[in-house]
Regions:
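Extracytoplasmic substrate-binding proteins
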Residues: 49-50, 126-203, 228-229, 284-315
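A ligand-binding cleft/hinge motif common to bilobed small-molecule-binding domains
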Residues: 122-133, 252-270
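His/Asp/Glu-enriched short active-site or ligand-binding loop at hydrolase and phosphoryl-transfer sites
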Residues: 209-236
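Short secondary-structure boundary segments
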Residues: 63, 120-121, 143, 198, ...
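Bacterial Sec-exported substrate-binding components of ABC uptake systems
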Residues: 2-65, 165-197, 311-315
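Short helix-initiation/N-cap motifs at beta->coil->alpha
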Residues: 46, 95-106, 232-240
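A short, structured surface patch at a secondary-structure boundary
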Residues: 32-37, 58-111, 115-121, 227
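Proline-aspartate-enriched helix->loop->beta-strand connector
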Residues: 104-121, 136, 241-255
């Protein structure tokens, strides 16, 4: 079975839940104290443009991952809108202005933001140009698809918002938590082969992750082997075929919760051609993680990693 489509990057439970049930997202651990932005700041956006921020009273993050950082820095009371991937409860009351990186210019401008934060995948490009043309400072932040990129992104967002010291503290705390989570992986144990599948059954999207998917970094940090990378997949995502699944030989299948739900839970998953012939399919070893946290690579990443360590190594 194959599919086309481009996934937003996708956290786990060895699962006996029904398709309607989903694992809880890791909670936000907001830094103590409310930082006072020191403005103006001038930063170099990831697209090379120099941006000056003079007012951070109405912040609009256009990705869930950036929203997570802004809220955890203690600036959530300044956020005026959210991306569809900002799934944590603290953001639930905010108006939705993007869907899968598709920005509504009219929706954004109606919120009167004083600074907009986006990443290189936010678009379409003409929408971003319109927002820049409106005079609102737009800062583009590099997306993070691996653990070493987490701290630099936290610091970049904090610097743009005039709270660099809080950014240093949050980055340091996150790095320490990630290190502690990695240390929980069993030493000397056989490493399970884990295949990350990006599933959107209602849209006919069935992809397997490979090198650069983001999931590969998490799987390896949790003491596993990314099955897609091990079988030689050089693209972040490749359409699933039964031959590819059988060749990947996963001991565990990792999915996002809504993706699992979209194919009818584990019962539906093992009916996808090739999955029942894998060790993971035969043993129904499936780990699903809440959609808004696995591939966010932010302050909650250590909690996701702890879940992976716990679930991937279950007998």
């Amino acid at each position: 079975m194959c599919a086309c489509g481009s996934p937003a990057r996708p956290p786990l439970a060895a699962t006996t839940r029904t398709p309607q049930e989903q694992p809880p997202a890791p909670p936000l651990e907001i830094l103590p104290g409310t930082p006072d932005p020191k403005l103006p700041t001038e930063v170099t956006s990831a697209d090379g443009k120099q941006v000056t921020i003079t007012d951070a009273s109405r912040i609009l993050p256009l990705t869930g991952a950036i929203s997570e950082v802004v809220f955890t820095l203690g600036l959530g009371n300044r956020v005026v809108g959210r991306d569809i991937a900002a799934t944590f409860p603290e953001a639930a009351h905010l108006p939705l202005v993007t869907r899968a990186h598709d920005v509504s210019v009219e929706g954004v401008l109606s919120l009167r933001p004083t600074v907009i934060l986006a990443d290189e995948e936010t678009g379409p490009p003409e929408a971003m140009e319109q927002l820049r043309g409106s005079g609102i400072p737009v800062v583009i932040v590099k997306p993070a698809w691996s653990l070493p990129e987490v701290a630099p992104r936290i610091k970049a967002i904090a610097q743009a918002l005039g709270v660099a010291e809080a950014g240093e503290r949050l980055a340091g705390r996150t790095e320490a938590q990630v290190k502690a989570a990695r240390a929980k992986a069993p030493a000397g144990a056989a490493k399970p082969r884990v295949a990350f599948l990006y599933l959107r059954g209602t849209a006919g999207v069935y992809l397997i992750g490979g090198k650069g998917s983001g999931a590969d970094s998490m799987i390896e940090a949790a003491g596993g082997v990314d099955a897609g990378t091990a079988m030689g997949l050089t693209k972040a995502f490749t359409p699933i075929t039964s031959e590819a699944l059988i060749a990947a030989r996963p001991d565990v299948i990792l999915v996002m919760s809504k993706g699992l739900q979209s194919v009818g839970g584990i019962d539906g998953l093992v009916r996808i051609q090739g999955i029942a012939q894998t060790p993971a399919g035969q043993r129904r070893r499936v780990v699903d993680v809440e959609d808004g946290s696995l591939l966010n690579f932010g302050p909650r990443t250590a909690r996701v990693l702890e879940t992976l360590v716990e679930r991937m190594h279950q007998a």
